[in-house]
Amino acid sequence: MRMLPDFFTGNWDDMFQGLLEAEHPFDFPEPSQAFEEISLHNLFDVELDESEGDPNEEAVDGMFPNWMLSEDHSADSGAASGDSGVGEDLVEVNLDLKCYEEGLPPSGSEADEAEERAEEEETAVSNYVNIAEGASQLVLDCPENPGRGCRACDFHRGSSGNPEAMCALCYMRLTGHCIYSPISDAEGECELGSNEETELPCSLTATAPVRPTPCRVSCRRRPAVDCIEDLLEEDPTDEPLNLSLKRPKSS
């Protein structure tokens, strides 16, 4: 440690402060406010004294011909005067941007599809008009096929907007939810003032089956019968059982 100089044995703060004080910053000159743009022309000494010969004269003349220098000078003068000189010979022309090209004629299949589509639209519109006209009235109907051609179903479909809607009667007939039997004709089919009697509804149940009747028990044997129905009939010879008498002994 004795061999080291005092500069390295001091405190690091003192050493850093000494380094900062020892440095001298470079004083750069401030740039001029009016900085001139340097072009490629300024890199070559084009204008020389006639007495001195320039070895690069031919190369410079080949790189910058006289016509290029004259155009550059005219552009600089035009920009300085405020007239660029561009667009002086332009004339206002009205352009028609409409396309007059005709497309290919439609094929036969496309024409048929267009006609079918138009017919479907017409039928849909007519159906909508018919539904709209009869939307204010609800008429009960009973078609052969439930849900098809029913005026009540059309009313519900037009009012709800659901094409699969059905009236309650067609729904019950289609699903067999209840036993259905027509009571009267559909509205509109029978004329007013007719004296014809309406048909009575068909019977909902078949003929009741014959049930056996209870018979009194007797000790006497019954005679032979030809069929089981004979057993269900009352035997006129049967007498009521007298409970006051003693039961006969069986041999």
UniProtKB/Swiss-Prot annotation:
A motif (LXCXE motif, interaction with host RB1 and TMEM173/STING) lies at residues 97-101. The keyword Magnesium does not apply. GO terms for cellular component: host cell nucleus. Residues 38-46 are annotated as: Interaction with RB1 in competition with E2F1. Residues 110-122 have a biased composition (Acidic residues). Keywords: Activator, Early protein, G1/S host cell cycle checkpoint dysregulation by virus, Host nucleus, Host-virus interaction, Inhibition of host innate immune response by virus, Inhibition of host interferon signaling pathway by virus, Inhibition of host STAT1 by virus, Interferon antiviral system evasion, Metal-binding, Modulation of host cell cycle by virus, Modulation of host E3 ubiquitin ligases by virus, Modulation of host ubiquitin pathway by virus, Oncogene, Transcription, Transcription regulation, Viral immunoevasion, Zinc, Zinc-finger. InterPro entries: Aden_E1A (IPR014410). Residues 74-136 are annotated as: Interaction with UBE2I. It comes from the Viruses. A motif (PXDLS motif, CTBP-binding) lies at residues 240-244. GO terms for molecular function: zinc ion binding. Interacts with host UBE2I; this interaction interferes with polySUMOylation. Interacts with host RB1; this interaction induces the aberrant dissociation of RB1-E2F1 complex thereby disrupting the activity of RB1 and activating E2F1-regulated genes. Interacts with host ATF7; the interaction enhances ATF7-mediated viral transactivation activity which requires the zinc binding domains of both proteins. Belongs to the adenoviridae E1A protein family. Plays a role in viral genome replication by driving entry of quiescent cells into the cell cycle. Stimulation of progression from G1 to S phase allows the virus to efficiently use the cellular DNA replicating machinery to achieve viral genome replication. E1A protein has both transforming and trans-activating activities. Induces the disassembly of the E2F1 transcription factor from RB1 by direct competition for the same binding site on RB1, with subsequent transcriptional activation of E2F1-regulated S-phase genes and of the E2 region of the adenoviral genome. This is Early E1A protein. It comes from Human adenovirus F serotype 41.
